[in-house]
Amino acid sequence: LALTSAMVLSLAACGGSSSDTKTSDDSKKASKSDVEYVQDKGTLVVGITDFEPMDYKNDKDEWIGFDADMAKAFAKSLGVDAEFVEIDWDNKVMELDGKTIDCVWNGMTLTDEVTSAMACTSAYCNNAQVVVVPSDKADKYQDKDSLKDLSFAVESGSAGEKAVSGEGYDYTAVSSQSDALMEVASGTSDAAIIDLLMASAMIGGGTSYPD
């Protein structure tokens, strides 16, 4: 598989917690309360998806990656252990509100929907949405107009889905970005829209998707 030069949307990544964002004073109170809650129970429960290179498992079935390592370091600073829970990305706000998880730490895009529903850190990573097609077809697709007749696979609830729906393209929503790549590799979909960070780690020579 290969990237095309058609960048769909520029984005930023963030970590999120607590849905109380009414005012700055309220946010400070909520933050203190949330920290005490986490410290009292001794664990920071982190909501993630399998999203290499941000969050993924090694051969020992341990969660590693840029975000996973940051979450572990943050939990250590609080004097607690980090516990990782795979979530349905569509349900991240519901999981937070129900206290099934304490935070979301998964290369999350700072959208109006996200920042209105939960308190977020400042963005610490620039990202983009990119189109992935079979490498033998990449030269055919270099602008938006060339993509309009393709069928896309995107992660449900992701920035990729927002981008493709905004363009009016035909698409199928799947449960994860890795599933979107599988759709393209199997020929079920013509292209996938995923994060540039994931695409850089998951496709090309030496990966599971070299072609």
Task: Please tell me what each predicted stretch does.
Residues 26-107:
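Extracytoplasmic small-molecule ligand-binding "clamshell" domains
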Residues 45, 79-81, 98-106, 150, ...:
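Alpha-to-beta junction loops
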Residues 118-131, 147-148, 176:
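Short Pro/Gly-enriched coil loops immediately N-terminal to beta-strands
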Residues 133-151:
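Flexible hinge/capping segments at coil-to-helix
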